[in-house]
Amino acid sequence: MEGKNEDMHTPRGPEDASNIADEYPSPERQQQGDMLGHDIHHHLDMHHERDARDTHSPGQTDMQTELAKQVAAQAIEAAVAHVQANADRQEAGGTEACGQVSNGNQRDIHMREEPHLSNSQHHPRQPVFPRSRQSFIALSPTSVATSIAGPSTLRRSPLPDTFSRSPAPLSANDQIAILRESYARNPNPDRKELERLAARTGRPWNKIREYFRQRRNKLRGLEQLEKMEEPGRASGWLQITYRSAPVTSQVPQLALYNSYRHRFDPYSSSTPLLGGQDLIQLACATFPGCEMARDDGEYVLKGLKEKDKEREDALGDNEAMGRKGREIDPEEWERGMEGLVEPLRAGSWLLSSFQSQPGTSGSDITQTDLYTSYAARFSSLLTGVSGTSNGNAHLNGHHGLSDEEAELRNHAESLKAFEDAGLGDTQGEEDQPPTVEESDQNETSPASFPADPNPLPQAPRESRLLTPVELINLTRMTFPACEPCVDSSGRFVIKGLERREGLEPGRKSREGEMFPFALMSEKQPGEEFVKVMKRKLASLHPDAIERRNAGESKRKRDDALTEEDKELIEGLKRFRGSKLGEQVRDVCVSQ
C-alpha cells in the first residue's frame, strides 16, 4: 500500500500530471482569465510562489516552454498597450507615418501570437506550470518597452517645422562688408574664390568680379593722386568721390573735410593738405550748382552727393534690398511731390524748401516772396486747366473770348494787388478762388463734354493752388515757431522762417555758412610721444648733452641783453596783454 501511495502521489509523466491537475485544481488555472488584463508586474509577484514548485517538476519541460510562450504573448500585449497609451498622450500631434509604423508593429505581434492563444484555448484541461526566472528577466517592462518603442522611435519622421531652413539672405551692408574684407586680403581673386564669395553673399560671381575690377581701377586712380600737388589732387579726389546733384541733396562740410583728411597723409611735407575753408571753396568751384548752406544748425553743401558705385555694382539692378538701402533720388522726390494734391503738395514743398530758425537775426522772408515762390513752382501744373476750359467754352458756345480775357485780367489784378500790399489787401484773395473754382467747375461739368460711347470711370483731380491766406495758415501749422507779423519797415513778413538753399535769389550770401575749421582744436601730443621725440632728437645731437652738462648753455643764457632788446621784450609783453593784441590774436586764429 505504501508503494501504491508513493506511485500515486509521485508524478511520473504527462498523464499523471493531468490527473493530479483534475483532483487538485491549481490556483493559477482559476485566475488565468483574470490575469489577462494585468501587466507584467503582477506576473513577477506570482513568480515567487511558483518558484518552490519548479524543483519538483523536472520532467515537464515541454509544457513549461509552451506556457512560457503564452505568458510572453500576454506580456507583449500588455507592454504594447501601455506604450501605445503613453505615446497617444505625449505625441497627440504626431505624424501619420509614426502611427502607421506603431500599428504595423502591433499587428505583427498579434499575428505572431495568435497560434499560441488558439492552442491554449483548445486545451482547457491543460495545467498551468511555472516558468523559469530567465523568461521573466527577458520579458521585463524595460526590455519590452525598448523592443516595442525602439524601432518606431527610430523610424519616426521629423515634424514639418523641424526641417532645416535656408539661412536668411544677407543685407546690402553685410554684402559690401564681406566684399571689402575679401578685397583687403586678395585684390585679384581667382574663379574658385569668386564662386565662394558668390555662395556666401548670394550674388552672381560675374557681378563680384566686376566689383573687384572697378574697385581696383578706382584705387589705382587714387594712388595716382598721391603724387600730385594741391589743389589738383583735391580737385581730382572730389571728382572721383562726389558728383553734382539737385539742391535737395546735401553733404555735411565737416564729413567732406574728414574724408579728405583721412584719405591722404596729413603729415606729408612735400604735399601738405588744404585747409577746410580752401577745400569747401574748391568743392563749390568744382561742381556747378554746389553752394554752402546751414541746414537745421548743420553746415552743409547743397547740390552735392557722394557716389554709390560700390553699392550699385555689388547689389545689381534687381535687388530689392539694395533699393531699400539706397538714398531717395531728389528728382524722383520732386516728381512725386507734383503728383500730390493740396494741401499735401504745399506742405511737402514747405518742408523741403524752408526751415524754422527762431533764434537767427537774419532777414525774414516776406509773405509776398513766399507765395510768389509757391506759385512759380506749381503754376506750370495749371496749364492743362486753362486749355481744357478753353476747349469746353468752344464746345458749349456759351462762353466767348471776352469771358476768358476777363477771368485772366481778374486773376492778374488779384496777384498784383497781393504783391503790392501783402496780406493787407483782401480783395485779391476773395477774387482769386472763385476764378479757379469756376475753371474747375467748367472742367468737371458733365454737360460740357460730348457723349463718350465707352466712358472710363475717373475721379476728378483737384489742380488748383492754395490762396495766400491758406498758404500762410499752412506755414504756421508746419512751423509752429514761425509767426506772421509786420516788421519795422511795414512789410508783411514771417518771423523765424528762412530758406534751406544757401543763396537767396537777389541777395548776398548769408554769414556763417562755412564751418569754422580754424576753431577745430587739434589733439595735443601725449607725454609718451614727447618723450620719444626728445630721445630721438638727443640721439641725433649727442654733443648737445655734453655741452648742457658742462654748463655752456647756462653761460649763454646769462649773457647780458642790450637795452634795445630789453625794451623790445617789454613792449611785446605790454602788447600781448592789450586789447589790440587780443584782436590780432583772434584774427590770426580765424585765418
Curated annotation (Swiss-Prot):
GO CC terms, sorted: nucleus
Mutant lacking the gene: phenotype: Shows normal growth at 30 degrees Celsius but exhibits growth defects at 25 degrees Celsius or at high temperature. Reduces resistance to osmotic/salt, oxidizing/reducing, genotoxic, endoplasmic reticulum (ER) and cell wall/membrane stresses. Reduces LAC1 induction mediated by nutrient starvation and leads to greatly reduced melanin production. Markedly increases the basal expression levels of ERG2 and ERG11 under sterol-replete conditions and decreases the induction of ERG2, ERG3, ERG5, ERG11 and ERG25 under sterol depletion. Significantly reduced the virulence.
Acidic residues: bias regions: 427-441
Segments for region (Disordered): 1-37, 148-168, 420-463, 543-563
Keyword Cell membrane listed: no
Gene3D superfamilies: Homeodomain-like (1.10.10.60)
Domain of life: Eukaryota
Subcellular location: Nucleus
CDD domains (alphabetical): homeodomain
Comp. bias intervals (Basic and acidic residues): 1-15, 543-560
One biological process term in Gene Ontology: melanin biosynthetic process
SUPFAM superfamilies: Homeodomain-like
Its job: General stress-responsive transcription factor that governs multiple stress responses and adaptations. Plays a key role in virulence. Mediates the expression of LAC1, which is the major laccase involved in melanin synthesis. Positively regulates BZP4 induction under conditions of nutrient starvation and basal expression levels of MBS1 and USV101, 3 major transcription factors that independently contribute to melanin production. Also acts as a key regulator of ergosterol gene expression.
Protein name: Homeobox domain-containing transcription factor HOB1
Organism: Cryptococcus neoformans var. grubii serotype A (strain H99 / ATCC 208821 / CBS 10515 / FGSC 9487) (Filobasidiella neoformans var. grubii)
